[in-house]
């Protein structure tokens, strides 16, 4: 059960609340760097998320001091505007200004009504309302309903990415994330790309076919190998794909693809497409062509 879905009766009403978060302003961003970040555990003890987030934060969270807390403790602390919080939630897309909507807005394809599993980085707020909490660069992990095996291995890389985002916010409260990705794009040709074969469209699922479109260094790997590369801060890049996975494909489903650096979480490339029979939930041939323009 996600952090704000405490009572079943409120699930429908609260499902989209975090999608309405707004970006932190300059003062709130500055306060973040003075804050302690509270890592909020999930109430569901059967999820592997809790041991994973504790392990990965311990390895990769460098930007602020942190403390792991329960949801009960979060309810007490969330009204403190001097504290920051990292927690899991579900959220629908909205027209409000937050980091994911900024990225999604670069691409056409219609309105996205899907719900996403989000790793939130926010400041506390006196009202205690989650949709009032200033967003510091929350990042989607997966579409809601995706099994943990589709996102837990990427949490370390996403934590690194979040820290890169908030450092950019410190320089400029309204950074041009697309420009940042484009500036980093040239690094793709100098770093080995690691991809999981099943996350590629069927026509790319052989090394021969992939190499025809991608002449640079690459490797087909497992989820465990990507997690280990992030833990070791290896000089490779990897695909962070967000899509329906094994869920039933709807007309509104989108596939979002990030290329991230395992070493430091830098965003090197991002693309998004509406899922269809011709464009499956996977990295496409056209994605490789676009990356290498």
Model-identified regions with their sequence ranges:
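Structural alpha-beta junctions
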Residues: 58-69, 209-221, 263-265
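Sec-dependent signal peptide cleavage junction
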Residues: 18-55, 61-64, 156-196, 200-201, ...
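Start-of-domain marker
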Residues: 20-117
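Bacterial Sec-dependent N-terminal signal peptides
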Residues: 1-25
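Flexible, glycine-rich surface segments
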Residues: 167-254
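A general structural signal for short secondary-structure junctions and capping/turn motifs
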Residues: 2, 75-78, 228-229
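Amphipathic beta-strand/beta-sheet edge segments enriched in Tyr/Trp
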Residues: 90-156, 227-293
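Hydrophobic beta-strand residues in large extracellular and virion-surface proteins
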Residues: 86, 119-121, 193
